[in-house]
Each structure stands twice: as structure tokens, then as C-alpha cells.
Amino acid sequence: MSLNDYLKDPWQGSMHKAYESAWIHMRPAPEFATSDVVMASLYRAVGFKDCAEGLVPKEGREFEKRLQAAKKPQPISGQIGLDTFRTIVHAVLESPKQPNQSSKRFLQMSPIVPDVALYSGSARISSNSWKPGLLVRRMIEMGSASPEKAELLWTRLFNAMSVDETDDVWARWLQDEFRQRNPGATEWKQAVSDWDNGLWGEEHAELHFPARIFVLDLEAALCAKESMTRRQWISILDAVIRLGTVSHVLWLCSLHERLWQRTVDVLDGVKASTGAVEIGNFIINVDRRMLGYGTVVMPQIRDYASAYLNARLSLNLLLWTLEELGEDLPVLNSATNIEKFLEIIERRRGDVNEGNFRSSRDDLVSRENKTLACKKGIGSNIIEFARHTLGQRQSLKESLRGYDQGYFLRKRGESRSASWNLLLGPVAILAVVHCCLREAAGPRSVRRLCDHLASYGIEVDVDDVDKGELGALLRMLGLVLDSPDAESGILLIPPFKQ
């Protein structure tokens, strides 16, 4: 690859190696996915490694054919009649389809037990689908302090997502029923992971980004399993994963924007050497105000996605330009290496500014304006991912209108054009309160909840908690105690057994 190759096609396979192999590179690239799709894909990533994401729709169609073959003998009889099992699959386990998919025939089931993920929960009905479960794996990799700790959490996740004697009767029966219906299905076993050693260093403990808090929250969610039924626990786990994955993607978008702005400053004459600590604080650490609670957020998410694309396009062009000038460029995988990168720019900015960099960038921005405006491609996919993963599931079926209570975005109104506001559903609140009080032995200040959400880039005013909709929902769920001495007059209570 070369600078000329990049100028011909800046998106497909032409990234500079100093960028492509760095953890700031967003991979896997997110696309459309509902929360059920992310959860089903996580089952496949952690325990069904031999089940390719693209095979799920085909396996679902084959499974459906077997269910509809009422007059044909079953190869292996289950514990219940075929008609009853059909009712379970199509009614009890039914998950809402997107409004534009209502007329399409494919299995859409709630991923309560592992074997459901063999037949349902692919991001696309076609065979060409991305793997949301690998995004969760990537966050575990980035958020853990070492490869050994990442592997330990991955193992704990597999054990918790497995169905064993500690699960309730319904979950054990359901998993056994699916397995008996298709004894030749892919075996459920832990996927072996090759963890990246290049993500960890002395800086890790000093940096603050969503993946770091996510691994702690994931551990807290795993500990909650014994306090509730399987379906309830999957809902809690689902809420934690929804918040973590989207916050991770938006953080990377924000990081790119800040890194590119610092790069522009250096090209314009600002001194590059500010120190790795300052780079960590102002470029890498999460912006605790990415999104505001209760506000309309989709325009902001679009802005983040657009800024990410602009920064990615420009940074890679600059990296290729510096390589053409003979520079040996560091991989952008640490604050120290980012500092070295900025120092190289400072040293060679005269050559960069006198060359074709700025005119080439202007040409690329003009040519790729639809992509940069998120009207197609990567940016559009990021917006779809955030909207459908965080947003409350919409359904044309009245019986499924209340299916999703773990949402983080809710529509203000019934019209198709109604805005999406950042508002937590009841299950999402239970999950977040449990996680922020994971080490608490009793009631704690509501500031812990605000600080916890800020770690994911969500700003919540402490004074608004008691007075607003969030405070009312906390009271309804029995998660607060009135205390005149406490901040805002209320204290948070752990929702589950510690």
C-alpha cells in the first residue's frame, strides 16, 4: 500500500499500519444491531465459535422447517409435543422484529439460553453479517489490566452464560429441549481467545475510558446472576452490554476528533510536546459530557460519527504523507506513542505544509462528502448501531410493546418522526444502580450514580435526580431512601443481594 493507493480509496483496506494496528482503530466496525442481536452474537463469540455469524439465518430457516413438518415424524422426540414447542418458539420466546421487517419470515427469539443463538439473532437476514459479539470481546481486551485478567473474565462470562444446575428450572428445561430437537448442533464450549499483548502498559491504570468501567460492571452483572431468574439476569446483562458497547464506540469517535484537532494545532505552529499525561487527559480519557440525560441525542451522535470519519480520513492521509517523507512512525497505541507522533509532525510540519497534504485532504473531503456526512457507509452504520442498540425496541404487535425495558433511548411521542431522548428504562436503572453500588454494603449518595454514568460519557445533574423523571423512577423501583442529610435528600439502595 502507498499514498497513491490511499488517495484512490481511503476506506477499504488502505489504512496506514501505524493506525490500523492501534487500539484507536474501531474494530469490528459497528453496523445495525438490536440488543438481542448483540447478546446472541456474544453467545456465539464466547461459546459457539464454530457457528459462523452468516450461517445463523440459514440454520434458523432449517429449524423452522422442522417445526412446521407437523405430519412428519421427528428424528428425536422432545419432552413436549411439537405444537407446544411451536408455541414456545413463536410466542413465549418471540422477540420484536423491526417495523420494516414485520412481513419477512425469519425466526426472532429472545436469547435466554445459548442454543437460541444458533437459530436467531443475526444482524442481517442475509449471510453477510458483522459480529457484534467480537465488539464485546474487544472491550474486555481493552478494559482489562492484562491478558491474564481478560482471559479470566472471558471464562467467567462463559460460565455465567452457560446453563447449569444453578439456573432456574425453566432455563434448564428450555436449553435441554432445544438440544434434544437438534442433537447434532454446534457444541457449546468456551472459545479460545488470543489476547493482544500490545494494549497494556504502565499508562493503563491512569487512563479512564468506557471499556475500563465496563469490565467492572460486567463482573458485577455476573455476580448478580444468583439473585434472580435466568430471564431477569439476561435483561440485566443486556443493559450493561448496551451501555458499554455504544459508549465505547462514541468514545472512539470523540478521541479521534480530539486527536485530529491537536494534530491541526501542531501543523499550525503549536508546540507538540505536552507530555503523555496531558495527552491521556485531553485526548484519550472519556469526555464525561458526551451526552446529556433527558436530551435529544441522535443529532449529537451523528456529529460524533461525522467527526470520527473526518479525523480518520485526515490522520491516515497524514501518516501516509509522513511515510513518503521517510519517517518511521510509531503505532498509535499509547499516549507515549501519540506524543512521539505529534513530535514528528512538529519536526516535519514545514515539509507537510509545503507539500500536497492540505490540497489532497481538501480533494478527499470534497469527494467523500456523502460518507463524511453519514449519509452512507461507516458513519450511517455507527448511527444505526447506536440508535438500535440503545433505543427501546419498536413493535407493530401490541403484545410486544413492553418487551424492552432495558433501553437507554426512548421516543418522545408515537409518531415516526418523534425525537429519541436519553432516558433510562426500569431494567437499565436497576442494572446501573447495581453496578455503581457493587462494592457498597449499604445506601450511598446519588452522586455515585451520576459519576458512574459520567464514566460512560453521560452527564446527569445531581440536583435533577430527585426532581426529574429519573428520581421518580428510582422511587418507583424502591431504589432510594429519603435522607435530609444526603445530597439531593436521597440515598441509593443496592437492588440485589451483595
Sequence positions of predicted segments:
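Charged, amphipathic alpha-helical stretches
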Residues: M1-A123
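Long, mid-chain structured domain cores
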Residues: I88-S273
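Positively charged, polyanion-binding regions of nucleic-acid-associated proteins
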Residues: L423-P443
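C-terminal engagement modules used by replication, chromatin/transcription, nuclear envelope/ESCRT
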Residues: L470-Q498
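Long, internal scaffold/assembly segments composed of regular secondary structure
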Residues: L222-D363
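Short helix-coil junctions and helix-kink-helix linkers
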Residues: P28, D451-D464
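Long, low-complexity, charged/polar intrinsically disordered regions in eukaryotic proteins
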Residues: E339-L424
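Basic amphipathic alpha-helical segments that dock to polyanions
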Residues: D83, T87-I88, W320, T336, ...
